[in-house]
Amino acid sequence: MSTLIKTLKDNHSDMYDRATTEVDLQQIHYVSDPVLFKLNKPAWAVVDTDNKRAIHLHGSNYQLVPYAKILNGLSDALDKYGITLDNTTMQFNVHPDLNYLRLRILFNDNSKFSPHAMKTNPKDKLKFGIEVVSSYDASIVYKIRAMFLRLVCQNGMKSFDSLGETIKKHTTHFDVDASFAKLQYLANTFEKMQDTFEVYNSLPLSANEVDSIFTRFSNGSDNKYNLLKQVLETDMHKSTLYDVYNALTNYSSHNKRAIKIGKKDSKEYRIDNSTMDSIKSNVMRDSEIENYIASDHFVYYYHKALGNLGRKIV
């Protein structure tokens, strides 16, 4: 038995049992309640055969990728590429209705990938990790990602790298097994990520620049803009690009929202919990950040940081 599968069976048996529930893809031609109707186009249902229930309906291009196949493929790849699980922490969640799965493997001290200490503050450590997410109801697209979790900040900053082109829709052309091959380059991926954060941390921003980033990311949403301002852990006049990035990831991590207090023209906000499912919110907001980080607006600051770092080295 491969290492990850044994660990999940031993330490996360309830979630593992959910993940390995037998599922099947069945073609549906008719619906009835109470009258029988024929569908114009057949649909395909992901069916929980153990509990005799349909999880979700899909079109003809959908490929069912059972959670068990994902876990077995990941487990085999970890063993194949020598990624041991000694001194790791696992966060494993499968929705009771089998709608989605999320597994995180975090590498602690004295593990295969010990945390990275930032150069400007050795107490500011970033913990490495791997995350896999998927769903049967199409609410979450399959992803396998390298990740960082910041340990010293109040909100637990996290960041992801998609390990190349492994963010895929479940179409008939998708090969889930091929996605795990990227794990052989995991050490290089982590090294590039930590270098990126050192670059972010090298660039001090003015208050106007911080405001510009929050405004562009918020895309006209006053609630989102004010949430970012409240979760920024540093003074806007004394923040780096790293600090601002930390605030963006707080937005994605904590499923919070800013709600206006008082009259219509009030500028006061309070932070409250969002009503959305936390894991679905997490994944959706992560995608927002990924898109913004790739935008010309953020890339401008990244290139500015590279130039600033180059001048310091010279």
Model-derived regions, located:
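A generic structural signal for short, solvent-exposed coil/turn residues
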Residues: 38, 95-97, 124
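A generic structural signal for beta-strand entry/edge sites
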Residues: 43-44, 52, 100-102, 141
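Structured alpha/beta or helical-core interaction and ligand-binding surfaces enriched in interleaved
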Residues: 57, 70, 75, 79-90, ...
